[in-house]
């Protein structure tokens, strides 16, 4: 891959998917729960990875732009037909468990309105319109949401 930033982003996407699949115990390629990198679809981007009912937008950059990223993730969730979009921002010098997972206030409100997350870690609120978990905490949220919800079509 000629573009170093693109190569770094692709590595982060793969690392992130491998991490969350390992934490949740997903490994079979036909398992609908497997977190998978999404194919590039052109003008209507559908996120970097799919973790039903979330799309994951991975970011491996030094300077965060979280509100902009969240607008992107929310639009990509709509394009993919998923209810929720989140951003997974790599933290330099830390492993994937410590990455930051950001969710917009609006999306978080819909999530807690649809699911009982009382047993899950509480995300840190921001004054800029979003909440944040670590990737390890988000994996527990994903597990809880999936226990109550599954896609209409299981592969």
Regions found by a protein language model. Name each.
Residues 1-155:
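Catalytic phosphate/metal-binding cores of nucleic-acid and nucleotide-processing enzymes, i.e., regions
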């Amino acid at each position: 891959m000629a573009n170093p930033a693109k190569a770094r982003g692709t590595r982060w996407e793969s690392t992130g998917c491998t991490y969350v699949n390992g934490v949740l115990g997903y490994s079979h390629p036909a398992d609908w729960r497997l977190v998978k990198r999404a194919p590039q679809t052109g003008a209507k981007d559908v996120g970097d990875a799919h973790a039903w009912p979330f799309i994951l937008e991975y970011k491996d950059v030094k300077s965060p732009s979280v509100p902009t990223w969240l607008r992107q993730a929310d639009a990509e969730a709509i394009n993919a037909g998923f209810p929720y979009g989140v951003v997974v921002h790599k933290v330099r010098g830390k492993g994937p468990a410590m990455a930051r997972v950001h969710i917009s206030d609006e999306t978080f409100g819909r999530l807690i309105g649809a699911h009982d997350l009382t047993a899950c870690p509480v995300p840190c609120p921001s004054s800029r319109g979003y909440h944040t978990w670590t990737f390890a905490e988000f994996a527990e949220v994903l597990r809880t949401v999936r226990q109550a919800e599954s896609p209409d079509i299981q592969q």
